[in-house]
A protein has these predicted regions:
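Short, well-formed alpha-helical segments that are part of the catalytic scaffolds
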Residues: 13-29
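A conserved acidic beta->alpha catalytic loop
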Residues: 42-50, 99-100
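Short beta-strand/loop segment that forms part of the nucleotide-sugar
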Residues: 32-44, 64
Length: 109
């Protein structure tokens, strides 16, 4: 089974993130032999993250909290380092939580 980690930095925009997770979950439901994990890097948000409803097709959601706001690029770098040091995976995908990236393109993998 192929393991794909989707790294998503977020700062306060939890509603957009929840929508994105729903779109990812819907997109991957028909993809066979795949394990999808989402790693959310919280860029020291001042709004407390909500409890997410457990998606059906995303197997795991982790949230890493930055101690201070460092910006989008630093969140990506922190997440990439974390994944390389702590996870066994086949592919790492970076997505923005603001809806700019299209989860439908996951089907092209």
């Amino acid at each position: 089974m192929k393991k794909i980690i989707i790294l998503i930095p977020v700062f306060n925009d939890w509603d957009s993130l929840e929508k994105l997770l729903g779109e990812i979950d819907e997109t991957v439901k028909d993809i066979k032999n795949i394990f999808i994990e989402c790693l959310i890097v919280n860029d020291a948000s001042t709004i407390i993250p909500p409890q997410f409803i457990k998606p059906n097709n995303i197997k795991k959601i982790n949230i890493l909290d930055m101690r201070e706001n460092r910006g989008h690029a630093r969140c990506n770098a922190f997440g990439i380092r974390y994944v390389n040091e702590n996870e066994d995976f086949d592919n790492l995908i970076l997505m923005d939580s603001d809806g700019e990236d299209r989860p439908i393109e996951l089907k092209l993998l």
